[in-house]
């Protein structure tokens, strides 16, 4: 697991609304999302960080070998990079971003386990 994917602080944590990766707001702005930056372009853009992440999430899981873990398969993160992931993320991506993802062939499924989509 790369050191930059581990949250550097327990305050100001946010979870990506697309993949549920958890980092500090500054880490998302400085490095982007390790899994989704090709689509969400959060790196260097604090406004996109606020739009594409949520500070409201439940539970965290540290994934060292996502490809070998049954938990990562259950959480739908087995194809993602090692890191810390939220179990459930409250919120949805803005409609414009969802349309852009769809046009690029990326299916968006909410990571909020409280709502069924």
From Swiss-Prot:
Stored InterPro entries: RPABC4/Spt4, Spt4, Spt4/RpoE2_Znf, Spt4_sf
CDD domains the UniProt entry points to: Spt4
Gene3D superfamilies on file: 3.30.40.210
Subcellular compartments: Nucleus
PTM note: Ubiquitinated by UBR5 when not assembled in the DSIF complex, leading to its degradation: UBR5 recognizes and binds a degron that is not accessible when SUPT4H1 is part of the DSIF complex.
Transmembrane segments: none
GO cellular component, one term: nucleoplasm
Assigned protein family: Belongs to the SPT4 family.
Function as written in the Swiss-Prot or TrEMBL entry: Component of the DRB sensitivity-inducing factor complex (DSIF complex), which regulates mRNA processing and transcription elongation by RNA polymerase II. DSIF positively regulates mRNA capping by stimulating the mRNA guanylyltransferase activity of RNGTT/CAP1A. DSIF also acts cooperatively with the negative elongation factor complex (NELF complex) to enhance transcriptional pausing at sites proximal to the promoter. Transcriptional pausing may facilitate the assembly of an elongation competent RNA polymerase II complex.
Name under which the protein is recorded: Transcription elongation factor SPT4
Species this protein is from: Homo sapiens
Gene that produces this protein: SUPT4H1
């Amino acid at each position: 697991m790369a050191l930059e994917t581990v949250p550097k602080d327990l305050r100001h944590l946010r979870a990506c609304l697309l993949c549920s990766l958890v980092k500090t707001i500054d880490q998302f702005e400085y490095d982007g999302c390790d899994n989704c930056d090709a689509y969400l372009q959060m790196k260097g853009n604090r406004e996109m960080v606020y739009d594409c992440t949520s500070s409201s999430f439940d539970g965290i899981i540290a994934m060292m070998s996502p490809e070998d873990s049954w938990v990562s398969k259950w959480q739908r993160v087995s194809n993602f990079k090692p890191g810390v992931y939220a179990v459930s993320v409250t919120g949805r991506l803005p409609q414009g971003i969802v349309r852009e993802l769809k046009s690029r062939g990326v299916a968006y499924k909410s990571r909020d386990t409280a709502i069924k989509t």
